[in-house]
From Swiss-Prot:
It comes from Chlorocebus aethiops (Green monkey). Residues 13-356 are annotated as: WD repeat beta-propeller A. The core of the protein consists of three WD40 beta-propeller domains. Belongs to the DDB1 family. It holds the Pfam family Beta-prop_RSE1_2nd. There is a cross-link at K1121 (Glycyl lysine isopeptide (Lys-Gly) (interchain with G-Cter in SUMO2)). One of its GO terms (molecular function) is DNA binding. This is DNA damage-binding protein 1. One of its GO terms (cellular component) is Cul4A-RING E3 ubiquitin ligase complex. InterPro entries: Beta-prop_RSE1/DDB1/CPSF1_1st, Cleavage/polyA-sp_fac_asu_C, RSE1/DDB1/CFT1/CPSF1, WD40/YVTN_repeat-like_dom_sf, WD40_repeat_dom_sf.
Length: 1140
């Protein structure tokens, strides 16, 4: 068997539905957003959107409509999922707890019926008498809305018009009346029917209109006083209500297709329209008042307001603010102004909401060489196309920064005796010290009486008896707070320079070369208590008091030069308690005693970024449990700070890290800053609970995130990225992208807008000897859109487009790889293409082009003609493996720098995906699932090992390990196939067994091995093996990892118990939602644990946790089973959350 754990690292971000309503209360205006399986509820306030609740549905939200039945004070929500679960939800709040109550639910799936090509449509009668659903061709399903019915019952009405494009309920009709656009062999028509609840059938409608525009695609029902419906087409907008017919054909809407609409005014006099190019229009209905007081429609008018993200849905909030929900780019809040700006636009973006979808391709790279992967995705499409750089870490939010190069240390001070908060920041430089006064958010340089400013400061701070201390290279200075004056000064007897110092509120230890001096701080006096000589020079020291020692430290920790040791000495006698040889040649640069979760530790950082950490016994001074991690490559400085009332350590280096403890294990979290040399905590009036951070050039004041999370950076391309790969030698990314150009009158094409491929620093164009340009059988006509494909070379640091190489006309770039071939020392970018002509069912020719990028130039090294489309390529044992239409082909690289075919495998329909491991090749087919090949180096050919005989339409594949293969298919499922090496017959051996099945509810475009969290960090006890990330159309990033059988069984037991305790919204069974479901079959999920459900254990109340753990058997690693406690499971689940 295969046991896997699948979990979300980034929830879906693409918006596929949005509505405005009074859902949380009669007064609140709410925005509800659907992001695939997630429903987000916001309140619209004067300051913007305030999140109220996020609900995870056990289903893909296909319909989301609000309605208010008579007698309700606020709106109810109707939701239908893609697996046909329907529910009516209500918002209930009591005190702090918010609940989404399921008022009614049911499944409205039919046993037979062909799901409509135009998808699921759900509508609600304006009088709230019924819900109408168009799920299958030829059927209209009705759910009567009875007040007290807990179960949603539905019945079907036969619909003669099989191909319905869009349908709506009309306003102001005695009986519920639908209006729809349908297509038949003669064209498209509009028709209306009355729905009779009693007879459960249609009656003739009030009007119909035959032969409307051939591209008519949307119906908008207009409220009273107008009534009737607006039909939106590609070129025209028409209004019908039986008596009146009005049509306009504004040229402005022809450029693109209108895909969404939203009513602005309750009386339906204005509508927003959004098209596929991201343009926003206003449709105005002008009224004419008749003599008898009735109102009729006088005219229709369309105005272009401006450009937004490409809208999937629009909803008007209030005061000219519109939410633009996007699937292809970031969603936006925009303001509609009365007057246009210089560009003639009435639209101003107020806020953007990051969307990673659709993730078309991605790669994991460790750009900063930090042992932590960053994910770079090809996201978005058309003008919303971008690269997204995603990394996990703790964010620092910058509040102020000052250009100050050369800072060597910094400390906060409270200059007056009765202050609670810091008001001063002391900065140390080589040979000088500067003092900054903090006044609110203002920062100004000042002088402190009693302080010296012409020497470097090693330590500065508030100490006992209302005094300040400044330790410089020359002396230790004690200064009274009121009045500010030097009251005591200690110098080394021979006036030698102090090299290192450490101080707490009443003790000082300084090192002068090999000598150590211990001083105590008394009122207006520094008293030398003892001194000693070490064998070697002291490199670093620390006397942080631990435990409840009244602020006094009985211990002194030091790190020495020469013998590279860390030692614990007893104060005041400097007696050696423990000596720890660290080994190696790199000296300790920073040492720190600290307490995490009431356990004491000694941390010691070396000059090469390595960190040793030990358990510390504060009674005996003994060190235990020695462990080592690598945090960076530069010397590391350790400083403590407090956040959320726990102690944390900040390790300053070229790779800043926060160290904290969770479940008595140290956790190392990346901080999203390039480098930090020094830091100190700062808590001033203007900057509460902040950190001051210094790098080589700047001082920054900021606040720190409480938890680590994904941070996303956007590099806009303004065109569609398709494929990405990373090339370490040239420190570049290769990206395949395509832009849209329009045929102009001269026969050439022009780009619609500036984008990455037209703005590159340099560019080149393919000229191929293989295809003469005249062979193109297809002539484009004026105004037609053509795709132009490019290879972009993008700098890994600045993400600047260094070079753009344009492929031939009609040539689509499909696959990309960066690799070395054979004995050739060069690394190449290799691109696989196809010549795409509209009249060909599948491409008949394409090419493989080998490029080399060096010294800022891109050269074509070789090209190879192929008979088909090069869908996928991978480097394979120094050769190039490619899939071309139905063939898998291996090329070797000759000394003449040419590609020569070595062998082929033909048994596929369309080989779209290739993954390799050792000599094994996994092939993902368009419709014939996966196939495993082995390459035989001796014979130089492929052998078919086994295949999955289930007809899965593949969207991505990956090799988990030698025997297990992961696949994603087009009905949003994941499955794992296993090679059965132990099988006795050839027949059995040739079958890949499906051992894992799971409904993900997401369309996976790409799998890749890698992780978003720190790797190689010493010890980990997570029970998982390996990590495969995946990216989906909705912008979700997920992770699949393998479990041992015992862990799988524990988590499966836990999952079943959680399902009894956690009530799902809409009363949808978890087992139903996760069951593997295609048009052919439905099977229960197996071999997969739903990590999102497991992790929800951390969010439930303590009593519910107790319910889950009751009588649960748990092996704590000793091999003995015992009853688990809630804390055992919290520990287990927290471990699992760390893998992403």
């Amino acid at each position: 068997m295969s046991y896997n754990y699948v979990v979300t690292a980034q929830k879906p971000t693409a918006v596929n539905g949005c509505v405005t309503a009074h859902f949380t209360s009669a007064e609140d205006l709410n925005l509800l957003i659907a992001k695939n399986t997630r429903l987000e509820i916001y309140v619209v306030t004067a300051e913007g959107l305030r999140p109220v609740k996020e609900v995870g549905m056990y289903g893909k939200i296909a319909v989301m409509e609000l309605f208010r039945p008579k007698g309700e004070s606020k709106d109810l929500l109707f939701i239908l999922t893609a697996k046909y679960n329907a529910c009516i939800l209500e918002y209930k709040q009591s005190g702090e707890s918010i609940d989404i109550i399921t008022r009614a639910h049911g499944n409205v799936q039919d046993r037979i019926g062909r799901p409509s090509e135009t998808g699921i449509i759900g509508i609600i009668d304006p009088e709230c008498r019924m819900i109408g659903l168009r799920l299958y061709d030829g059927l209209f399903k009705v759910i009567p809305l009875d007040r007290d019915n807990k179960e949603l019952k539905a019945f079907n009405i036969r619909l003669e018009e099989l191909h319905v494009i869009d349908v709506k309920f009309l306003y102001g009709c005695q009986a519920p009346t639908i209006c729809f656009v349908y297509q038949d062999p003669q064209g498209r028509h509009v028709k209306t029917y009355e729905v009779s609840l009693r007879e459960k059938e249609f009656n003739k409608g009030p009007w119909k209109q035959e032969n409307v525009e051939a591209e008519a695609s949307m119906v908008i029902a207009v409220p009273e006083p107008f009534g009737g419906a607006i039909i939106i087409g590609q070129e025209s907008i028409t209004y019908h209500n039986g008596d009146k017919y009005l049509a306009i054909a504004p040229p402005i809407i022809k450029q693109s297709t209108i895909v969404c609409h939203n009513r602005v005014d309750p009386n339906g006099s204005r509508y927003l329209l959004g098209d596929m190019e991201g343009r926003l229009f206003m449709l105005l209905l002008e009224k004419e008042e008749q003599m008898d007081g009735t109102v009729t429609l006088k005219d229709l008018r369309v105005e272009l307001l401006g450009e937004t993200s490409i809208a999937e849905c629009l909803t008007y909030l209030d005061n000219g603010v519109v939410f633009v929900g996007s699937r292809l780019g970031d969603s936006q809040l925009v303001k509609l102004n009365v007057d246009s700006n210089e560009q003639g636009s009435y639209v101003v973006a107020m806020e953007t909401f990051t969307n990673l979808g659709p993730i078309v391709d991605m790669c994991v790279v460790d750009l900063e060489r930090q042992g932590q992967g960053q994910l770079v995705t090809c996201s978005g499409a058309f003008k919303e196309g971008s690269l997204r750089i995603i990394r996990n870490g703790i964010g620092i939010h910058e509040h102020a920064s000052i250009d100050l190069p050369g800072i060597k240390g910094l400390w906060p001070l409270r200059s007056d005796p009765n202050r609670e908060t810091d008001d001063t920041l002391v900065l140390s430089f080589v040979g000088q010290t500067r003092v900054l006064m903090l006044n609110g958010e203002e920062v100004e340089e000042t002088e402190l009486m009693g302080f010296v400013d012409d020497q470097q400061t090693f330590f500065c701070g508030n100490v006992a008896h209302q005094q300040l201390i400044q330790i410089t290279s020359a002396s230790v200075r004690l200064v009274s707070q009121e009045p500010k004056a030097l009251v005591s000064e200690w110098k080394e007897p021979q006036a030698k320079n102090i090299s290192v110092a450490s101080c707490n509120s009443s003790q000082v230890v300084v090192a002068v070369g090999r000598a150590l001096y211990y001083l105590q701080i008394h009122p207006q006096e520094l008293r030398q208590i003892s001194h000693t000589e070490m064998e070697h020079e002291v490199a670093c020291l620390d006397i942080t008091p631990l435990g409840d020692s009244n602020g006094l430290s009985p211990l002194c920790a030091i790190g020495l030069w020469t013998d590279i040791s860390a030692r614990i000495l007893k104060l005041p006698s400097f007696e050696l308690l423990h000596k720890e040889m660290l080994g190696g040649e790199i000296i300790p640069r920073s040492i720190l005693m600290t307490t995490f979760e009431s356990s004491h530790y000694l941390l010691c950082a070396l000059g090469d970024g390595a960190l040793f950490y030990f358990g510390l016994n504060i009674e005996t001074g003994l060190l235990s449990d020695r462990k080592k991690v690598t945090l960076g490559t530069q010397p590391t400085v350790l400083r403590t700070f407090r956040s959320l009332s726990t102690t944390n350590v900040f390790a300053c280096s070229d790779r800043p890290t926060v160290i904290y403890s969770s479940n008595h294990k140290l956790v190392f979290s990346n901080v999203n800053l390039k480098e930090v040399n020094y830091m100190c905590p700062l808590n001033s009036d203007g900057y509460p609970d902040s950190l001051a951070l210094a790098n080589n050039s700047t001082l920054t004041i900021g606040t720190i995130d409480e938890i680590q999370k994904l941070h996303i950076r956007t590099v806009p391309l303004y065109e569609s990225p398709r494929k990405i790969c990373y090339q370490e030698v040239s420190q570049c990314f290769g990206v395949l992208s395509s832009r849209i150009e329009v045929q102009d009158t001269s026969g050439g094409t022009t780009a619609l807008r500036p984008s990455a491929s037209t703005q590159a620093l340099s560019s080149s164009v393919s000229s191929s000897k293989l295809f003469s340009s005249s062979t193109a059988p297809h002539e484009t006509s004026f105004g037609e859109e053509v795709e132009v494909h490019n290879l972009l070379i993008i700098d890994q640091h600045t993400f600047e487009v260094l070079h753009a190489h344009q492929f031939l006309q009609n040539e689509y770039a499909l696959s990309l790889v960066s690799c070395k071939l054979g004995k050739d020392p060069n690394t190449y970018f290799i691109v696989g293409t196809a010549m795409v002509y509209p009249e060909e069912a599948e491409p008949k020719q394409g090419r493989i082009v080998v490029f080399q990028y060096s010294d800022g130039k891109l050269q074509t090294v070789a090209e190879k003609e192929v008979k088909g489309a090069v869908y996928s390529m991978v480097e394979f044992n120094g050769k190039l493996l490619a899939s071309i239409n139905s063939t898998v082909r291996l090329y070797e690289w000759t000394t003449e720098k040419e590609l020569r075919t070595e062998c082929n495998h033909y048994n596929n329909i369309m080989a779209l995906y290739l993954k390799t491991k050792g000599d094994f090749i996994l092939v993902g087919d368009l419709m014939r699932s996966v196939l495993l090949l082995a390459y035989k180096p001796m014979e130089g050919n492929f052998e078919e090992i086994a295949r999955d005989f289930n007809p899965n339409w593949m969207s991505a594949v990956e090799i988990l390990d030698d025997d297990n293969f992961l696949g994603a298919e087009n009905a949003f499922n994941l499955f794992v196939c296993q090679k059965d090496s132990a099988a006795t017959t050839d027949e059995e051996r040739q079958h890949l067994q499906e051992v894992g099945l799971f409904h993900l509810g997401e369309f996976v475009n790409v799998f890749c091995h890698g992780s978003l969290v720190m790797q190689n960090l010493g010890e980990t006890s997570t029970p998982t093996q390996g990590s495969v990330l995946f990216g989906t159309v909705n912008g979700m990033i997920g992770l699949v990892t393998s479990l041992s059988e015992s862990w799988y069984n524990l988590l499966l037991d836990m999952q079943n118990r959680l399902n009894k305790v956690i009530k799902s919204v809409g009363k949808i069974e978890h087992s139903f939602w996760r069951s593997f479901h295609t048009e052919r079959k439905t099977e229960p999920a197996t071999g997969f644990i739903d990590g999102d459900l497991i992790e929800s254990f951390l969010d439930i109340s303590r009593p519910k946790m107790q319910e889950v753990v009751a009588n649960l058997q748990y092996d704590d690693g000793s091999g003995m089973k015992r009853e688990a406690t809630a804390d055992d499971l919290i520990k287990v689940v927290e471990e699992l959350t760390r893998i992403h």
